[in-house]
Amino acid sequence: MLASVAGPISLALVLLALCTRPAMGQDCSAQCQCAAEAAPHCPAGVSLVLDGCGCCRVCAKQLGELCTERDPCDPHKGLFCDFGSPANRKIGVCTAKDGAPCVFGGSVYRSGESFQSSCKYQCTCLDGAVGCVPLCSMDVRLPSPDCPFPRRVKLPGKCCEEWVCDEPKDRTAVGPALAAYRLEDTFGPDPTMMRANCLVQTTEWSACSKTCGMGISTRVTNDNTFCRLEKQSRLCMVRPCEADLEENIKKGKKCIRTPKIAKPVKFELSGCTSVKTYRAKFCGVCTDGRCCTPHRTTTLPVEFKCPDGEIMKKNMMFIKTCACHYNCPGDNDIFESLYYRKMYGDMA
């Protein structure tokens, strides 16, 4: 009797398990099939991450957006996919982990929440700190024979400035005078080199976007196959944030230009760690109001290994010498990352 009853009961339990598994588990059973084209272009401030199944790169979902196993929330903003009750585990909502709120411009934002401080900046609150990225293009237009006087202007009804080509004041018998057509100082490719009817031009690297910790430095060049202007970027670290450099200033001195680092370091980027250790140079500090910034640098590739095993290679600035000066960004500059001080002598 028991045996005859156990059969139907066991079958019912198996069927119940099969029916509830898609709702309770993670839907990663499908074969990895990613789009043939390059990785998607994410909006400003949105991370490009691997989907929850480790298959394809996707734009991370933001606070309050719907999420699934294949459409994860932005981990760099402390977000996770809250699936709610155990009975519904297919679709969730991106929720912020516990973190301190931010007060910005008289408004309070939750940790993980993104907002526009103005039409020019997209900001994110993360555990009490606000980080912003520009929404307007930061491109640089170099002078050229067809546009020797480029200038950025604010146009009516538009938020971002745009490039316009001013007519030269003086004209010669053979056309506009090119007296203002000067090449910027460059390091690397020869700026006077003509290659396939292309005048190669490269600007200097901009200052690092962070005064301490990992930041970004950029430059513009047309040194490519199509002779088109493109922006290049590299990682940079002027000094570690946790280092107390003032204690290394010698008695009677007001600055320490390039402090000695006791041991090799590993760089970190968005949870990923450099494969190798580096005995890098960093810039020091002053006690008389001056700031120390990189003066001569070089660019080298650095490999980073992420927790999921992915290896990514990024170009990074390595400091050769530093200079201490009074040309410093303002202490109340909220968007200090937009401050640029040119660096010289880069060999890459």
Swiss-Prot record:
Disulphide bond pairs: C28-C53, C32-C55, C34-C56, C42-C59, C67-C81, C73-C94, C255-C292, C272-C306, C283-C322, C286-C324, C291-C328
Known SMART domains for this protein? CT, IB, TSP1, VWC
Which residues does the UniProt record annotate as the domain VWFC? 100-166
User: GO biological process annotations for this chain's record?
Assistant: angiogenesis; cartilage condensation; cell migration; cell-matrix adhesion; chondrocyte differentiation; chondrocyte proliferation; connective tissue development; DNA biosynthetic process
In what residue span(s) does the TSP type-1 domain sit?
197-242
State which tissues express it: Testis, spleen, kidney, lung, heart, and brain (lowest level in testis and highest in lung).
List, alphabetically, the Pfam families matched. Answer: Cys_knot, IGFBP, TSP1_CCN, VWC
UniProt keyword annotations, A-Z: Cell adhesion, Disulfide bond, DNA synthesis, Extracellular matrix, Heparin-binding, Secreted, Signal
Q: Which residues form the IGFBP N-terminal domain?
A: 26-97
Signal peptide location:
1-25
Keyword Signal appears in the UniProt entry: yes
Among its keywords, does the record have Thylakoid? no
Q: Name one GO molecular function term.
A: integrin binding
CTCK domain span: 255-329
Question: Where does it mainly reside?
Answer: secreted
Q: Name one GO cellular component term.
A: Golgi apparatus
Location of the protein in the cell: Secreted, Extracellular space, Extracellular matrix; Secreted
Region (Heparin-binding) residue spans: 246-348
- InterPro entries found in the cross-reference section: CCN, Cys_knot_C, Glyco_hormone_CN, Growth_fac_rcpt_cys_sf, IGFBP-like, IGFBP_CNN, Insulin_GF-bd_Cys-rich_CS, TSP1_CCN
What are the inducing conditions?
A: By growth factors.
Function, please? Major connective tissue mitoattractant secreted by vascular endothelial cells. Promotes proliferation and differentiation of chondrocytes. Is involved in the stimulation of osteoblast differentiation and has a critical role in osteogenesis. Mediates heparin- and divalent cation-dependent cell adhesion in many cell types including fibroblasts, myofibroblasts, endothelial and epithelial cells. Enhances fibroblast growth factor-induced DNA synthesis.
Subunit relationships: Monomer. Interacts with TSKU.
Similarity comment text for this entry = Belongs to the CCN family.
Question: Protein name, please?
Answer: CCN family member 2
Its organism's taxonomic lineage begins at: Eukaryota, Metazoa, Chordata, Craniata, Vertebrata
